[in-house]
Regions:
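Heptad-repeat coiled-coil/leucine-zipper oligomerization helices
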Residues: 5, 9-12, 16-19, 26, ...
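Cys-dependent condensing catalytic cores that perform Claisen condensation/acyl-transfer
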Residues: 2-4, 29-254
Length: 254
């Protein structure tokens, strides 16, 4: 390509032609970036049916397992809240759903979190820490080394645990807000893993995880980050949301 001295020797018409070609080349380069493939290099997950890694999720899917179960007793007493009539106040008309096992289990020491802080942490934040670590390991990375220019895009839309914690006024402490605040869910990942890229939480209801992946792809193509962690988490721990959905006829009876 011509340098500045070469350009000075060109006629105005040739200089304009050169600049147009250079501008076109830059535009084409930008357009190529917008359609460049993005590699999925690692996964971490928890799904109903005991799926805790990509291999077990594939087994659940390939075997066509039905992961819908009756609402576990450690969530709430379904007999107390069930009524087949959707108009009954304070009741839900379904006894079933898709639930994860052992959502109260968490190795706080591994993540450098005190027992006191871990108690006030929403289990959704705990799950995000675990699966993010596993995703990086699955990608062949060493999470403890940290990665600069890595974005975090997390979908969240419900915080049953936060309502429980804040509902006990005498038990509210310095960790109660950070343990249940949506924005902290992404920030905690970035801080713990030593990441310096974009870090955000998105709430678009049922589409949240897809939107998080979409935003991650946009950020990668814009050059805001070189690697991105994207996903979502949703735990139903108390009956209120099911009661609300029942009143809106959003739940299948089976």
């Amino acid at each position: 390509m011509a340098n500045e001295l070469d350009l000075q020797t060109l006629s105005p018409a040739k200089r304009a032609l050169y600049e147009l070609r250079a501008a076109r080349a830059r535009i084409e380069a930008l357009e190529r970036v917008q359609h460049e493939p993005i590699a999925l290099i690692g996964m971490g997950l928890r799904f109903p049916g005991g799926a805790s890694d990509p291999a077990s999720l594939w087994r659940v899917l390939s075997e066509g397992q039905d992961t819908i179960t009756e609402i576990p007793a450690d969530r709430w007493d379904i007999e107390q809240y069930f009524d087949a009539d959707p108009e009954t106040p304070g009741k839900m008309y379904t006894k079933h759903g898709a639930f994860l096992d052992n959502v109260d289990g968490f190795d706080a020491r591994f993540f450098g979190i005190s027992p006191r802080e871990a108690t006030t942490m929403d289990p959704q934040q705990r799950l995000l820490l675990e699966v993010a670590w596993e995703a990086l390991e699955h990608a062949g990375e060493r999470p403890e080394q940290g990665r600069s220019a890595t974005g975090v895009f997390v979908a969240l839309s419900n915080s049953d645990y936060g309502r429980l914690v804040m509902g006990q006024q005498d038990e509210i402490d310095v960790y109660s807000s950070t343990g249940s605040n949506f924005s902290v869910a992404a920030g905690r990942l970035s801080y713990f893993l030593g990441l310096s890229g974009p870090s955000m939480v998105v709430d678009s209801a049922c589409s949240g995880s897809l939107v998080a992946v979409h935003l991650a792809c946009q950020s990668l193509r814009a050059g805001e980050c070189r690697v991105a962690l994207a996903g979502g988490v949703n735990l139903i721990l108390t009956p209120e949301i099911n009661i609300n959905f029942s009143k809106a006829r959003m739940m299948a009876k089976d």
